[in-house]
A protein has these predicted regions:
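Glycine-rich phosphate/nucleotide-binding loop
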Residues: 51-152
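Short acidic loop-to-helix transition motifs that present clustered carboxylates
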Residues: 43-51
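Conserved small/polar residues in nucleotide/adenosyl-binding loops
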Residues: 161-168
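Glycine-rich phosphate/diphosphate-binding loop of Rossmann-like nucleotide-binding domains
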Residues: 1-44
């Protein structure tokens, strides 16, 4: 595949949600027959959240695929590995178009309080620019964002790194 993904992890609970996840799983299997070079593995949602905490690198260069409810759970769980949900961006791809957005909601309770992390919005734009064929611009945005975060000077409270005290 062009994107470099090695495996799709489909997340269900079809042992309990037989009808809805049964429909989802049938669609996954049908699609997998068209893309035989990409591996497919099924995880139940409860086990997937545990694996994301214990062994997140297992899912590098892979696609996590599920229904909206389970992906809401997964995105919250996984966001802890990268700082907060404020850093998670997403892309929804169709046959001819794509849409990019932060994974978090609008958080109106934080309006005007200078607390909201802009990283997901910035990186959503970087991913969109890459989709539009401007990979060099996308790389520059990702690099600049990474540099600012690593500098640890201009970050929101959810990313602020403080050294552990000698007692820790």
């Amino acid at each position: 595949n062009d994107a470099g993904f090695r495996k799709v992890f489909a997340i269900t609970k079809r042992n309990i949600l037989k009808e809805t996840d049964g429909i989802f799983w049938a669609a996954v299997e049908k699609t997998q027959r068209e893309f035989k070079t990409i591996g497919l593995e099924e995880y139940y949602i409860d086990n997937m959240t545990q694996q994301l905490v214990k062994n997140p690198e297992r899912f590098n260069n892979s696609v996590l695929l599920s229904t909206n409810l389970f992906m809401d759970i997964i995105s919250e769980c996984a966001s802890g590995h990268v700082g907060s949900i404020g850093t998670v961006y997403s892309g929804n791809y169709g046959d001819h178009y794509a849409m990019f957005e932060p994974a978090h909601g609008s958080a109106p309770k934080y309006a005007g309080k200078n607390k909201v992390n802009p990283v997901a919005t910035i990186l959503s734009g970087a991913w969109m620019v890459e989709y539009l064929g401007e990979k060099h611009i996308s790389k520059a945005i990702f690099k600049a964002t990474e540099d600012v975060i690593n500098e640890n000077k201009y970050v929101t409270y959810c990313l602020l790194y403080t050294s552990p005290s000698p007692r820790d």
